[in-house]
């Protein structure tokens, strides 16, 4: 009937909007926290200007702690993304089952919504994976800086 068709279409649209919003929230929440990465990068470059071993060690410990905290936040967001993905699969699986025999464009709309949400989810995974790698870059630059400082003292 027209009523059940309209109801099913509304469910598809509502589900798509809900999951799009949840994916967007993951990226926006982590983007504010990811600002620690460029700040740490500045700190890692500052290691090259430090003169005492105590300063180097304190700066490096600060970089490591920042990388650990940033990584933990990113991993938490990755887990949240996995939970969102799982619930999306359950809901859209139910919708797929309910309209499997539908001959209207509703089935096509559902498949298009699922594809777009999967694309957004893949993008979120790539962003989070990139940020996880970038979170450790300042620490590695700091270690390289300290090694360069120690090189003249090795011989």
Locate the predicted segments by residue.
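Short, structured coil/loop segments at alpha-helix boundaries
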Residues: 51-55, 99-114, 122-128, 151-154
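Inner-leaflet juxtamembrane helices
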Residues: 60-103
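Membrane-proximal, non-transmembrane alpha-helical segments
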Residues: 1-30, 34
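Coiled-coil heptad-register positions
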Residues: 31, 38, 45, 85, ...
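Short, charged cytosolic
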Residues: 1-12, 96-112
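N-terminal soluble segments of membrane proteins
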Residues: 1, 154-155
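Loop-to-transmembrane boundary segments
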Residues: 18-24, 28-31, 107-142
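Alpha-helical transmembrane segments and their immediate juxtamembrane boundary regions
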Residues: 28-78, 132-135, 139-153
